[in-house]
Amino acid sequence: MGQVMLVTVLLPTRHRTHLVERTVRSLLDLANDPAQIEIAVAYDEDDTESHDYFTSTSWVTLVADYGAELQVHKTPAWGYQDLHNYYNLLAGRAQGKWLLVWNDDALMKSAGWDTMVKQEQDYMGMLHMITENYRPKFALFPLIPQKWVDLFGSVSLSNSNDSWIHHICLEANAIKLIDAVVFHDRADLTGNNLDQTYLNRTNQKKLYKSESMRQIRHEWAQRLIEYRTQL
């Protein structure tokens, strides 16, 4: 284990290297201290485009020029139905005190967003950044402490990772709003990035809403409540 960072950005991707470069630049350009940011990428083992990019000098140099940390993982092609597998793998290797559940089609809009996280770095719960173009009251890109993974063993058990975290923290009354703003450049919201990666998304809402999954989320919320009362 290396240096402890402030934030690890959890970033799974497939066939979208141009979006990865854009989103990473948005995060690091607007960070007050990019040297405290770790970019953690996961890509599928059959994704040759990503393999070529993430093993290139241009990618390594892009991150290094900001002084940020970097890790890249080639994974099984789990697919969107098991999106949580990517986040869980990355979280298990993250060096950040905080974990940002991020997408390659997201853009950071707020300067000093990392300072906002640092100001709340001892909070045990979810930090909520506003998504300016979609459901601002819902945490589409949640920040959770590494202690979350210590407590539960994973980020999420559902490919609806944002909903999983948000609903648990909502029940536990463990949500804190910060002033950072994100733009989600998703195909159904903006008309952009209507590619095969987007089209291959599979809806798991029925499973997410099942009684068994509801019960697990409730149990996690109760464990979070108990943990917070001991602080």
Q: What are the language-model segments listed below?
A:
Residues S163-L231:
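C-terminal catalytic/acceptor-binding lobe
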Residues Y87-W98:
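Active-site nucleotide-sugar/metal-binding loop of Leloir-type enzymes
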Residues G125-F141:
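Short beta-strand-to-loop element that shapes/binds the nucleotide-sugar donor at the catalytic cleft/hinge
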Residues R25-Q36:
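Short, acidic, metal-binding catalytic loop of nucleotide-sugar glycosyltransferases
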Residues V41-W59, L107:
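A conserved acidic beta->alpha catalytic loop
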Residues A111-M126:
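Conserved donor-nucleotide/metal-binding helix-loop-beta segment in metal-dependent transferases, i.e.
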